[in-house]
C-alpha cells in the first residue's frame, strides 16, 4: 500500500533516521483513523516516520493500526495504558527519531505535500518552527473552510515582532518543530 522509503541495501526503516517524525495520538478512533493513516502514508515526503500512540483504546483502533503497520514499516506503534492526551504526546515525542516533529490528530487528513513543504522551508531557512494553514471540513457539508487566508505565506518572520501569527494559529498540528528546539 505504501512504499517504505529509500534506504541502503540491508538497512531497515528502523535503522535509517527519518527527517520527520509525525506523532499521532490515538484513543477510540477506529471509525475515521484509517483515512488519517491513508493521508500520512501517501505523503510525498518519503523520509517520514509515523509514531502512532495508542492510549489504551477500547475499540478496534489498535487492530486497525497493527494492520496498517504490517503494510508500511514507517509506522511505529507505541501501545500504552490510557493516561490522556498529554502523556500520549510526550511518549510519542520521546519515541520519535526524526530531526523534526509533526503532530497529526487522528481526525486530520493532511494534504499530500504538507510535510515535504514544511521540511523544505525549515531546512532552507534553518527554522525551529514552521507553521501552515488548514482547512476545516464537516461531514454534513461539501465545502472546505480555509482559515487565516490573509496571513503572509512562504515568508520568514520573527515571532517576537509578529506574535499574532503564532498566537492566531496555536494548533500544534499546523506546524513542524525541530526536535532539539
What do the predicted segments below correspond to?
Residues 4-6, 11-181:
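Nucleotide-sugar donor-binding/catalytic module of glycosyltransferases
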Amino acid at each position: 500500500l505504501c512504499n517504505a522509503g529509500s534506504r541502503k541495501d540491508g538497512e531497515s526503516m528502523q535503522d535509517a533516521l527519518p527527517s520527520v517524525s509525525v506523532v499521532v495520538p490515538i484513543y477510540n478512533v477506529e471509525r475515521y483513523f484509517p483515512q488519517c493513516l491513508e493521508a500520512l502514508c501517501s505523503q510525498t515526503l518519503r523520509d517520514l516516520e509515523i509514531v502512532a500512540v495508542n492510549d489504551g483504546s477500547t475499540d478496534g483502533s489498535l487492530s486497525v493500526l497493527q494492520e496498517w503497520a504490517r503494510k508500511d514499516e514507517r509506522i511505529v506503534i507505541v501501545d500504552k495504558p490510557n493516561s490522556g492526551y498529554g502523556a500520549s504526546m510526550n511518549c510519542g515525542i520521546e519515541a520519535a527519531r526524526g530531526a523534526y516533529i509533526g503532530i497529526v490528530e487522528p481526525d486530520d487528513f493532511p494534504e499530500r505535500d504538507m510535510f515535504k513543504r514544511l521540511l523544505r522551508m525549515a531546512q532552507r531557512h534553518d527554522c525551529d518552527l514552521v507553521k501552515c494553514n488548514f482547512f476545516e471540513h464537516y461531514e454534513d457539508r461539501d465545502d472546505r473552510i480555509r482559515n487565516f487566508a490573509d496571513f503572509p505565506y512562504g515568508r520568514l518572520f520573527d515571532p517576537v515582532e509578529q506574535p499574532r501569527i503564532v498566537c492566531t494559529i496555536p494548533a500544534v498540528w499546523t506546524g513542524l518543530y525541530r526536535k532539539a528546539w
